[in-house]
Amino acid sequence: MASAPPASPPGSEPPGPDPEPGGPDGPGAAQLAPGPAELRLGAPVGGPDPQSPGLDEPAPGAAADGGARWSAGPAPGLEGGPRDPGPSAPPPRSGPRGQLASPDAPGPGPRSEAPLPELDPLFSWTEEPEECGPASCPESAPFRLQGSSSSHRARGEVDVFSPFPAPTAGELALEQGPGSPPQPSDLSQTHPLPSEPVGSQEDGPRLRAVFDALDGDGDGFVRIEDFIQFATVYGAEQVKDLTKYLDPSGLGVISFEDFYQGITAIRNGDPDGQCYGGVASAQDEEPLACPDEFDDFVTYEANEVTDSAYMGSESTYSECETFTDEDTSTLVHPELQPEGDADSAGGSAVPSECLDAMEEPDHGALLLLPGRPHPHGQSVITVIGGEEHFEDYGEGSEAELSPETLCNGQLGCSDPAFLTPSPTKRLSSKKVARYLHQSGALTMEALEDPSPELMEGPEEDIADKVVFLERRVLELEKDTAATGEQHSRLRQENLQLVHRANALEEQLKEQELRACEMVLEETRRQKELLCKMEREKSIEIENLQTRLQQLDEENSELRSCTPCLKANIERLEEEKQKLLDEIESLTLRLSEEQENKRRMGDRLSHERHQFQRDKEATQELIEDLRKQLEHLQLLKLEAEQRRGRSSSMGLQEYHSRARESELEQEVRRLKQDNRNLKEQNEELNGQIITLSIQGAKSLFSTAFSESLAAEISSVSRDELMEAIQKQEEINFRLQDYIDRIIVAIMETNPSILEVK
């Protein structure tokens, strides 16, 4: 984790001469106003730093030094001696960023004014306004390069030296490497970052909460795999853009400073999409307000991380652990470089690529100064890797440039977006050592040659740097152990995957063998089924052939029977014709008999009516005679009474005679009814015979249009046999019918059958 190094332990600084008379608040400390106090590359100018008490002791002769001391960044032993004052040096100003002593402060003697270095006509030294410095370095008074055409900060102005806090109040002592400004090691505190805009300090706690939620193991770094796994809800392209902002160097891990810088770049609309590269904004412009999309992003990201379980990536290699060649290298952070690289650097901090690029223009470095054209309309300083290739001895942990170390004096640039490290380049240890050496030996030859006194430095800087390097060595050992554990875990995973692949191959072979066996079994079953179907088909064909032979034999037999059947049919036809002739003759005779019967019936009815009239007349006559007989009997009875017979005998005889006469009349009436019924029966029998004859005529009314031989030849054997059976049935019915008619005639009227 790229955290700020703690303060050097007490007693590590070598003793020096007594400080100025009066201490930090004495008269010697107040003689800073008449001239520019001292100009240090990347060193602060101003009052005390509340966060670094007791870190840097007052340097011997710091107040008595009448000139301005120059240092190329935090490297030790690069301070210069006093320089002659120049007319172009502006007076230092006091304010919240750097409290310089007033001109009327008492002191033992006047201090000599150190002029600013003489610049070419294109540049001039100007003091940075107090509202332009980063919020985390309020006591610094940085100076900027400014074009001679303008005395104010404009679009073409570029920060060259970053502001850093002063070591003690009232003195401008030499800054002691990367360990001089002690920062709190707890990153959970919401101090504004060096590159944090003034108007967005309230975003620090929210971003810290999001970062802590993403940092599941609590080591201060978020792996790219974890972040990609979390941010996949935004889409592949958006995740790629986010990782480009949050990890521009391609190290595979994200620190909180990188996270904050990336979110700030996204919020400010960085066109290049890189956290540490960009364009210096105008000083007078207010910081951009946080858009609603940024608030939504932070809120959604925090909710997503707190609601979802942290899942570590165990299947892919991190980008920081992959091996690259000399052509694909990136700048190694000084706080995360290996121990060998730190030792080869000679204890110096990260070089100032701005000055290194000015020294090596032939290797692709480019310095864009104010007043010169730029593709984006702004003046930037960009360090581009040269064409030189160096071997990379050993493996070491590499990380991005931390904005916190940028603010603490690691780089001599006031803007954390000053350097633009290429995400696809990675420098070797020799390259880093060369940069560190050049940074330590840099004398600003492009601007002005400093005095030889700048190469002197206190011994306490070396002690602090040794402590710093020891801590870096411990951190690198921890990183190496973590890398070894990860490599062992990946090797274990690889072994498991190999075993799994072998198991899958064996399973595949077993499946193939099983499939072959199944294919063979199915082929055998199909062959057996085919043989069975062929046998059944052959048996069925044999049965059909046998059946066909039987049908042929039956057909031949039926053909042999056909002539006999034809002869029988002809004989039956002759008999039928004879019967039809007889029926015709009988029909004629029947019609004649019916005519005679009708005439006889008419005659009979006439006689019956005549008989009925005679009967009625006879009945009336009988009635009259009976009455007369009764009258005569009464007279006879009276005469017998007169003769003396008894009346009872005569009355009984009278009744018996009357009863006898009634019975005789009843007998005659019944006989008449019997005769009437017989006549009706005869009439009904005649009607039955007539209807039977008409039915016989209808049966024989069918006309034969074709000859019997033609009909027989045109039909099949089955149809012929069926027709013969029907004809035999009809003949049998006709024979039976004729017999019944003859029997009925013989019973009713046998005279019809008599030959006349």
Swiss-Prot record:
Quote the biased-composition stretches of kind Pro residues, using this chain's numbering. Answer: 1-24, 84-94
FIP-RBD domain spans which residues?
694-756
Residue runs in coiled coils = 485-694
Q: Where is this region: Disordered?
A: 1-204, 645-664
- What main location does UniProt list? membrane
User: Where is the region Important for binding to DYNC1LI1?
Assistant: 2-435
Protein name listed in UniProt: Rab11 family-interacting protein 3
- Organism in which the protein naturally occurs: Homo sapiens
Question: What high-level taxonomic lineage is stated for the organism?
Answer: Eukaryota, Metazoa, Chordata, Craniata, Vertebrata
Instruction: Name the gene.
Output: RAB11FIP3
